[in-house]
């Protein structure tokens, strides 16, 4: 009897706490406009969320992004599409410039959206194949569906082979096409 009563009390307490939390969340999510005395029933104004982060991180809202390298590898294999990994930093001027150029290029966006599993990372991954010549940013690495890093698809720099500049979008698009076309002949 004692255990049954304790269980009922616990359920009631959890339910009450859940209700209170829900009410508090609703109150915080809406700010009322009290400055206009002409309105009898104030309109709720949603609070603006500053710095809301999404998986695209500004690289293209229309593109479906995966969250982790492991998820990207699994989806690449499952969907028989290459994985394109963009390594960057949020506050790096070169990363920001490349991001703007990538978003502005319609063909790059179309290829990314339709033909690739896409991942952008702001932190290093454990797989050293993702940094064959260093951990610089921005760098773009392609991985085929057999989970092989495509070391043949490089940028134009000899000392940082997988680096791309904002002016290198045509080169990046060319490598995206190569990553896609080799896929059909290799598999």
Swiss-Prot record:
<feature type="signal peptide">
    <location>
        <begin position="1"/>
        <end position="20"/>
    </location>
</feature>
<dbReference type="InterPro" id="IPR036249">
    <property type="entry name" value="Thioredoxin-like_sf"/>
</dbReference>
<comment type="function">
    <text>Probably involved in cement gland formation.</text>
</comment>
<keyword id="KW-0732">Signal</keyword>
<protein>
    <recommendedName>
        <fullName>Anterior gradient protein 1</fullName>
    </recommendedName>
</protein>
<dbReference type="Pfam" id="PF13899">
    <property type="entry name" value="Thioredoxin_7"/>
</dbReference>
<dbReference type="GO" id="GO:0005576">
    <property type="term" value="C:extracellular region"/>
</dbReference>
<dbReference type="InterPro" id="IPR051099">
    <property type="entry name" value="AGR/TXD"/>
</dbReference>
<keyword id="KW-0964">Secreted</keyword>
<comment type="similarity">
    <text>Belongs to the AGR family.</text>
</comment>
